[in-house]
């Protein structure tokens, strides 16, 4: 697999913040449905219920092994799923903004998805905040890979081989982290 273009890499906005931007086929309401509907979200990230209100619960169940037919490499067995977490909605503005906590209840980070029309496409901006350095490194390759799977579904294409792409992306982020201070690496 070819390494990603530098423009596609997540950008570190602050030591605790990474941002990704993608242009996706629209309309906005269609992309929104892939954020809030369990079956559609499960195609690219994690299934589970989402209470559509600030303070509502988000149940996320990751089944990464189901995102493509590729066998799970040994090094990723622990990430293959199912992995369940319970989070809290922190922003809900259909169909333009969704945010929820991420990670442990003791020290959660937060993920914000923003959608806006951009010509005949939709600009998705994903911002992950309140990350310590290791967490930022850990989530960057995952977000990049999951967003590639989302883009494929929205484009009507088969998703890329999840584990091969994740391996390539993590290597690219690792090299970029050494070469440039405005992007982040993945573990």
Q: Language-model segments: which ranges?
A:
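Hydrophobic ligand-binding cavity/cleft-lining segments
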Residues: 1-53, 57, 185-187
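A conserved amphipathic terminal alpha-helix motif
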Residues: 2-3, 129-184
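Beta-strand/loop substructures that line and gate deep hydrophobic ligand-binding cavities in soluble
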Residues: 17, 99-152
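Hydrophobic/aromatic beta-strand elements that line small-molecule binding cavities or substrate pockets
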Residues: 22, 48, 84-91, 110-117
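A short, structured loop/turn motif at beta-sheet edges
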Residues: 28-29, 51-54, 90-95, 115-123, ...
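Short beta-edge strand/loop motif at the mouth of beta-sheet-based domains
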Residues: 38-82, 162-170
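Short connector loops at helix/strand junctions that flank enzyme active sites
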Residues: 53-57, 80-85, 93-95, 108-110
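Alpha-helix-centered segments that form part of catalytic cores
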Residues: 81-89, 93, 169, 173, ...
């Amino acid at each position: 697999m070819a390494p990603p273009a530098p423009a596609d890499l997540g950008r570190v906005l602050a030591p605790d913040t990474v941002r990704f931007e993608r242009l996706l086929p629209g309309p906005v309401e269609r992309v929104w449905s892939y954020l809030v509907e369990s079956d559609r979200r499960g195609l690219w990230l994690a299934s589970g219920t989402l209470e559509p209100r600030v303070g509502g619960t988000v149940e996320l169940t990751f089944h990464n092994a189901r995102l493509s037919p590729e066998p799970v490499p040994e090094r990723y067995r622990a990430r293959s799923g199912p992995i369940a977490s319970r989070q809290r909605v922190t922003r809900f503005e259909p169909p333009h903004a969704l945010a929820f906590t991420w990670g442990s209840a003791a020290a959660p980070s937060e993920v914000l998805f923003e959608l806006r029309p951009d010509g005949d496409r939709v600009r998705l901006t994903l911002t992950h905040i309140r990350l310590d350095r290791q967490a930022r490194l850990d989530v960057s390759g995952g977000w990049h890979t999951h967003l590639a799977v989302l883009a494929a579904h929205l484009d009507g294409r088969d998703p890329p081989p999840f584990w091969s792409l994740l391996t390539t992306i993590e290597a690219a982020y690792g090299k970029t982290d050494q070469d440039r201070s405005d992007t982040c690496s993945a573990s």
